[in-house]
Amino acid sequence: MHKYRTHNCNALQISDVGKEVKLSGWVHRRRDHGNLVFIDLRDHYGITQIVFTDQNLQLMEMASRLRYESVITVIGKVVARSGDTINDTLTTGHIEILAREFIVESAADTLPFVINTEKDAPEDLRLKHRFLDLRREKLHNNIILRSQIISHIRHLMTARGFTEFQTPILTASSPEGARDFLVPSRMHSGKFYALPQAPQQFKQLLMVSGFDRYFQIAPCFRDEDARADRSPGEFYQLDVEMSFVTQEDVFSTIEPVMYDLFTKFTDKKVSETPFIRIPYNESMLKYGSDKPDLRNPIIIADVTEIFRDSDFTIFRENIKKGSVVRAIPAPKAAAHARSFFDKMIEFAISEGAGGLGYIQFSKNDKAKGPVAKFLSPQQLESLKATVNISDGDAVFFVSDKKEKAAKLAGKVRIRISDELDLLEKDCFKFCWITDFPFYELNEETAKIDFSHNPFSMPQGGLDALKNAKTTAELLELTAYQYDIVCNGIELSSGAIRNHKPEIMYKAFSIAGYSEEEVNKRFGSMIRAFKFGAPPHGGIAPGIDRIVMLLAEATNIREIIAFPLNQQAEDLLMNAPNYVEDKALKELGIMLLPSARKNVEQE
């Protein structure tokens, strides 16, 4: 017999009755019934009930003193449970083990929180004792699911002719849009490596190197604030790059991977391929977001022209000053109480709106509400047709500059859906957002900057860049840039790359970078592109967000084994931490007085 176990805790069935077995695991629960002690023994695979009887009083008394989460090895006979004690929620629920001996492999101290319940302890306490937290069923299963998803991704990608690579972790800083994690060099004093925000340049260089289809389960490091769906330190992505491809080639390659993943690991309805394509400007108009949740049936409409010559002075004057008016329908909400409309107005104001107009179209064909009296019957009919609403519906209005109005309308759209419970249940709805702006105005400097990935190919190529003379014309330029969105969550960004040095120099010069600076920051890639670079493109779906959706987790830390907390601290390993002065001296680093003060205080 094996030293620790003949079976795992999820293996024994009614067909095993009469066998002598050995099991090892953690004491999950203990119940003392006087003449009987029951222990639920748990391992990675499941739970088996162990029973100690008063026929071996000493053994039973020892079992009654076992602390939860102690590790034990038990030897005993498999017996059938009586009919009224069968537990159909357990795979092993038809049997139990009548113990004849056990060994304590490792006794547990008093637990800082309860393991055998789904009730959450404070998160920082859980993260400090993550090795205990990971024993809980839901979290344990999430980590197993993550492994299965990544394994299946590898299978899907290799089956499609992709080669898996590992790119460097110590590299140079590049402008990916977030702060770098910097690593000082001991051998090159005063110089720093950066942990990669993404393997962007390396995967493009692999295409230049003649490889055709690259993928990597890539760790990425960004020094940015935490969110519910974003870890503050590192995350993983399915990094993909392909040579000699168009945008549609990328779509048709990734769509079946996403569809296969989501249909394999969930019973929910998944969007059929091909996924719907929505240009960026259309998405901002109809949904008020470049990450639309298509489970929400509400579609925003532009009603600027209806109000341009209306008697509603506020909107009419706004339009004269360059603002727009967006209408957000509220299906079957016309008969709702005044409190519903007041609550919506309060919400809009809390989001920065000056107010929120509305009209109720009652079933007797009467329009009421604060805005209705300012519109003629013809304008009201035009409004109903434009917004696609009918009697019994209500409609809300926001008016502001185009970009702000879009975002406000998008937030109102989501809030209406929540209030009216409109969100379609038990489904994953995918879409592509395409034709992103190539440039944007930097909010701090008011200068032209890249909107997304600076390595994207502008639509129209070099001619488009040369022909755009004004700021307005530059902001109208679009890129071969795309996002894949599922249920309102951006899973990935991607692009067809700019593989021509002359276009890259021009694109960067418009954003304020000299040719010398481009060569300094991206010299390796520019140099490579001068020796024959294939047209190429790629994408990088976020592994963590995919697992979050499939695990139905609301917090990204619930699908990562050892995450940082929201303050970017590893409470288990006590990181970040201070290092000795000797190590700093070797690296040529001296702490500022404010940083030195923090060291001394701790």
UniProtKB/Swiss-Prot annotation:
Region described as Aspartate: spans on this chain: 200-203
Binding site for ATP: R222, D223, E224, E490, G542, I543, D544, R545
Superkingdom of origin: Bacteria
Segments passing through the bilayer: none
Location (main, coarse): cytoplasm
Entry GO terms, CC: cytoplasm
EC class (word): ligase
BP terms from Gene Ontology: aspartyl-tRNA aminoacylation
InterPro entries per record: Aa-tRNA-synt_II, aa-tRNA-synth_II, aa-tRNA-synth_II/BPL/LPL, Asp-tRNA-ligase_1, Asp-tRNA-ligase_1_N, Asp/Asn-tRNA-synth_IIb, AspRS_core, GAD-like_sf
Binding site for L-aspartate: E176, R222, H452, R497
Site (Important for tRNA non-discrimination): H33
Keywords: Aminoacyl-tRNA synthetase, ATP-binding, Cytoplasm, Ligase, Nucleotide-binding, Protein biosynthesis
One MF term in the entry's GO annotations: nucleic acid binding
Catalysed reaction, written as an equation: tRNA(Asx) + L-aspartate + ATP = L-aspartyl-tRNA(Asx) + AMP + diphosphate
Documented EC number(s): 6.1.1.23
Subcellular location, record wording: Cytoplasm
Subunit structure: Homodimer.
Function per UniProt: Aspartyl-tRNA synthetase with relaxed tRNA specificity since it is able to aspartylate not only its cognate tRNA(Asp) but also tRNA(Asn). Reaction proceeds in two steps: L-aspartate is first activated by ATP to form Asp-AMP and then transferred to the acceptor end of tRNA(Asp/Asn).
Family note: Belongs to the class-II aminoacyl-tRNA synthetase family. Type 1 subfamily.
Protein name stated in the entry: Aspartate--tRNA(Asp/Asn) ligase
